[in-house]
Amino acid sequence: MFENKSKLTPLERFWGLIHPDRKEIKNVYIYAIFSGIVNLSLPLGIQAIINLIQGAQINSSWIILVFLVTLGVAFNGLLNIFQLRIVENLQQKIFTKAAIEFAYRIPRIKMEQWQKKYAPELMNRFFDIVTIQKGLSTMLIDFSTSSLQIIFGLILLSFYHPFFIIFSLLLIVLIGLIFRLTAKKGLETSINESTYKYKTVHWLEEVARTTLTFKLSGDSTLPLKNTDKVTSKYLEARESHFQILLKQYGLMVAFKVMMTLGLLAIGGILVMEQEMNIGQFVAAEIIILMLMNSIEKLIRSLETIYDVLTGLEKVGAVTDLDLEKSEGMDMEKDCSECGMKIELVDFNFRYPGDQKIILKAINL
């Protein structure tokens, strides 16, 4: 499930995570597309209803339109339920696969890989699987659905007047620039924050492991001093990450205000110039409200996306460790009768990453 390759980017790890379940994820996106299209039935239906009311045509057509709009809302809710079911299955599968993979890999990791690592502390990374589980729902449902609704909403607005086309293209470019300019730094600060989070947990585990030593030493201040040190580092890292989030939130809010002002102004001018009727204007305002709601979801999902990508990077601290080779001799079967002879000629040994040779020119 998790790629066993070094120096994978968090995004590459994410694609590796979802690739085995691409069929289910494809269904989630299909439901999201249909949901985005069905959502547009609400403003279009209301536009048609207002036009009928203005024309004093309150007849069976009006009743049918009301029924169809209500049916569209219900169908959209049903699509969301289908999405939730698929994502829940994926979450359960991710947890199960991760647990099995950890259990398989841990006994097979090369011994030299543990020389500079503390295995029990490294297993804390498994808790990031829960973060990935919860965040996957946001990424696959909220983020994708909101993005599609923004695109579909802007496309629909473009049919009302060519001015909306230019405005929509400008807004899409601005969203892309916001993510491009801030996403990389946000991920870096999120990973740094997570690093100090685990250092804090590791120190607390060490205090718990050596609790008898601290009791016998009397009123030791070491637990509090070191806790204060690692916690301060965590708070610094968290504040750095929050500043990036704050910057992104600010830019998205500015984008939201600009979009609201622009769309309302263009719509109002078109109504006064009689290039749009009241029904179209009301429908456009409903679309704008839907776009605002989608942008709010995008803003709220940013931190979750960082958490998922950071979690994958932290889980990689275990899954990237090299495994022992499984091929070789079956000593019990091949050597039970004849025995086995081992000969060393000019044998040298040093630990991985160290320059100093521990054993040199050994002959046996």
What feature does the model see in each segment?
Residues 22-42, 51-96, 104, 115, ...:
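Transmembrane-helix motif of ABC transporter permease domains
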Residues 88, 196, 219, 243, ...:
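Cytosolic ends of transmembrane helices, especially the final helix of ABC transmembrane type-1 domains
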Residues 24-29, 65, 69, 134-135, ...:
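Hydrophobic alpha-helix/TM-entry signal in multi-pass membrane transporters
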Residues 319-364:
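Primarily ABC-family ATPase nucleotide-binding module
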Residues 32-33, 65-80, 141-192, 265-276, ...:
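Transmembrane helices of ABC transporter permease
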Residues 100, 104-121, 192-242, 249, ...:
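Loop segments that connect adjacent transmembrane helices in multi-pass transporters
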Residues 1-42, 55, 59-65, 83, ...:
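Membrane-integrated ABC transporters
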Residues 46, 107-152, 209:
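Juxtamembrane loop-to-helix connectors within ABC transporter transmembrane domains
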